[in-house]
Amino acid sequence: MKFELDTTDGRARRGRLVFDRGIVETPAFMPVGTYGTVKGMTPEEVEATGAQIILGNTFHLWLRPGQEIMKLHGDLHDFMQWKGPILTDSGGFQVFSLGDIRKITEQGVHFRNPINGDPIFLDPEKSMEIQYDLGSDIVMIFDECTPYPADWDYAKRSMEMSLRWAKRSRDRFDSLGNKNALFGIIQGSVYEDLRDISVKGLVEIGFDGYAVGGLAVGEPKADMHRILEHVCPQIPADKPRYLMGVGKPEDLVEGVRRGIDMFDCVMPTRNARNGHLFVTDGVVKIRNAKHKSDTSPLDAECDCYTCRNYSRAYLHHLDRCNEILGARLNTIHNLRYYQRLMAGLRKAIEEGKLESFVTEFYQRQGRPVPPLNVD
């Protein structure tokens, strides 16, 4: 992987990630395909929304179908028939999200398999091996996503262990002869001094890109913005910056304003299945009765398959009848909305008009522009 940086506007960056499997224009949003599928979508449909890279989940694909089944097909690309690049998380987030069935030790994490209850163990070395078999174009180090709230002492211990795991991840990645990209993950909760130590330690180890982890886990938005404003300038300018698990459309906008290049989140797909749809002027809850006889498109400014062909009334009908097609059409729209948002941000950065774009984005939704505390 090669990262090319074209231009900046304030702290926002316009560039691209170059892979053997294709080019990803940045800032980029990556749809989440946890089990080897972006829920309800074929790879061709995902690509048609404008997505150039997707995300897979190491932990869940390890449990089912498992490494051996994956290797029978070649790798995850061959298994799911996605031709573009794939980023896989390391399983570290499951350390956070499956907290009631796990035990963290220096060596790794002991889990109860959420499928059948069997005891299992995952460590940095195993995570690197699984991601190697998946053929991931971007491999993430194995870390602990520090929960929120966490006091300073716990956050320090967690961050320091994640640094040690980062070195073990790097060593195993290299010993496998993996020629793809490996990203480090910056931890330290909401504490700037701990984030400083984490960035410095990861840069000393050396990675192809750097993710900001441990945000969007319940902390106030002001803390997320503050940490991004503090951390991003410390990340080497020639490396991509990835904000993990984020987020709402406004979170993408605020991340880009502060120098983030990559995002992922289940929100557009999960919300679509629940009838919560993103449009230029905010949000449409298609389940509401007021849409029952509305013959207008979901978003008159959207060029997606759903908006070009179907009315709000039809989408409301499908949702009320619990039809699978409704979830699919909603997902197509939400994914396209996110990709259109990213394309708009990229164009605004190219033209040096990012703050004008941001102002219009919030004005259309009747909301104030959040303050930006950067030099």
UniProtKB/Swiss-Prot annotation:
Per the record's keyword annotation, is Mitochondrion included, yes or no? no
Q: Name one GO molecular function term.
A: metal ion binding
Residues that bind Zn(2+), according to the entry? C302, C304, C307, H333
The note on cofactor binding and number reads: Binds 1 zinc ion per subunit.
Q: Cellular component per GO?
A: cytosol
Keywords from UniProt, A to Z, are:
Glycosyltransferase, Metal-binding, Queuosine biosynthesis, Transferase, tRNA processing, Zinc
Cofactors required: Zn(2+)
Q: Where is this region: RNA binding?
A: 245-251, 269-273
Q: Where does substrate bind?
A: D89, S90, G91, G92, F93, D143, Q187, G214
Question: InterPro entries, from UniProt?
Answer: ArchSynthase1/Queuine_TRR, TGT, TGT-like_sf, tRNA_ribo_trans-like
Q: In which pathway does it act?
A: tRNA modification; tRNA-queuosine biosynthesis
Question: Which residues does UniProt assign to the signal peptide?
Answer: none
Q: Cite the Pfam families for this sequence.
A: TGT
Q: Does the keyword Transport apply?
A: no
Provide the active-site residues from the annotation.
Answer: D89, D264
Tell me the GO BP annotations in alphabetical order.
Answer: queuosine biosynthetic process; tRNA wobble guanine modification; tRNA-guanine transglycosylation
Q: Which family does it belong to?
A: Belongs to the queuine tRNA-ribosyltransferase family.
Q: Which NCBIfam families match?
A: Q_tRNA_tgt, tgt_general
The function of this protein is: Catalyzes the base-exchange of a guanine (G) residue with the queuine precursor 7-aminomethyl-7-deazaguanine (PreQ1) at position 34 (anticodon wobble position) in tRNAs with GU(N) anticodons (tRNA-Asp, -Asn, -His and -Tyr). Catalysis occurs through a double-displacement mechanism. The nucleophile active site attacks the C1' of nucleotide 34 to detach the guanine base from the RNA, forming a covalent enzyme-RNA intermediate. The proton acceptor active site deprotonates the incoming PreQ1, allowing a nucleophilic attack on the C1' of the ribose to form the product.
Q: Share what the entry says about its subunit structure, partners included.
A: Homodimer. Within each dimer, one monomer is responsible for RNA recognition and catalysis, while the other monomer binds to the replacement base PreQ1.
Report the protein name in the record. Queuine tRNA-ribosyltransferase
